[in-house]
Amino acid sequence: MKDTKAFNEQRAEIYWWLSSLFAKELTQEELDHYHSVEIRSFLTGLGENETLKPAIDSLVDALNRLQTREDAQLELSADFCDLFLKTDKHGALPYASMYIGQTGLLNDKPAKDMEEIMAKHNLVVNQDLKEPADHIAIELDFLGNLIIRSNETELEEELEKSFAVQQQFIEQQLLTWVPKFNVKCHDIDTFGFYASVSSLLLAFCKLDTQYLAGE
């Protein structure tokens, strides 16, 4: 169980990291950190998994190209804005409602469903995320918190139950729309940094459901 809990911490950290990338633009300091040995080693480690390798290779390629991109931080912030802060027609809005809602508007049923899930588990997400509950950053932050909470148990049976809850969340709240979101990111993000992040998110969600199912 000790190894499982340690792995849970790693899983949560990955979801929190992905959440942070979709939550706001990277600052210059944060961008500089992505060129550090620490982060590059972390990415290399993830890339050792065959499922994640294509997305990691794309992300590393984008990071390498950022080092020679003029006004890299400003340009990457503009990419973030074009993708996630504009209109559905011209961007890849990071809300479940825009992909699986009925109205084509924000705060549709997926947002209400997510609010109910958060209330049911009595879990608070990052208070800096002042967005509808079905924003991808909120859903990923919540998932990380859900994983960490499961580490509080000392019973194998309870841990298995928590795995089933996590698997259901990924399959019903993420994999129902993240594939469509990923396609839009690739259609719009010509530079490719955020497109590679969305690919990594999708690949990791699929990989994680296999792990949770015991495959």
UniProtKB/Swiss-Prot annotation:
GO BP: protein complex oligomerization; protein folding
Gene that this sequence comes from: torD
Name under which the protein is recorded: Chaperone protein TorD
Coiled coil: none
NCBIfam families found in the cross-reference section: PRK04976.1 (NF003442)
InterPro entries per record: Chaperone_TorD, DMSO/NO3_reduct_chaperone, HscB_C_sf, TorD-like_sf, TorD/DmsD_chaperones
Annotated SUPFAM superfamilies: TorD-like (SSF89155)
Predominant place of localization: cytoplasm
Family to which the UniProt record says this protein belongs: Belongs to the TorD/DmsD family. TorD subfamily.
Keyword hit for Nucleotide-binding: no
Job description of the protein: Involved in the biogenesis of TorA. Acts on TorA before the insertion of the molybdenum cofactor and, as a result, probably favors a conformation of the apoenzyme that is competent for acquiring the cofactor.
One GO location term (cellular component): cytoplasm
A Pfam family recorded for this sequence: Nitrate_red_del
Cell compartment(s), UniProt: Cytoplasm
PANTHER family referenced in this protein's UniProt entry, alphabetically: CHAPERONE PROTEIN TORD, CHAPERONE PROTEIN YCDY
Entry keywords, A to Z: Chaperone, Cytoplasm
